[in-house]
Amino acid sequence: MSEAIYNGIITDTKLGVEDHGLLTFTLGVDFDEHAHCGFGGCSFGASYLEDSSGKSVRKYRNYPYTSELLMRILETVGVSTWEELKGKYVRVKTNSRFGKIIAIGHIMKEKWFNIEEFYKEKESGY
């Protein structure tokens, strides 16, 4: 598959807990006239019930690099709050015309953010 770059607009955002207890985010992006894809979907943490001596207690788990990942997305798009993302023009790099968004970029600057590369760098110690 060949990569392609398109101009797009962030049409919707989600930051919240899925029904199975995982904290996730997604940016919905319209691009190339009829294409709409989501960017993100990765888990930041989880909440779950743990039975401790016959009593259910809600436990929370944070995953590494969560705050940095969110901040890198905001920096890339050029905003300071999650709420400002909706309506912003961006560039998207996809693995095909209607495929997965693999990176999101600033509309004017040569500034990109790729989630998979971000985690690979963190895991390798760079």
Language model: regions and residue ranges:
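Short beta-rich binding modules
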Residues: M1-Y126
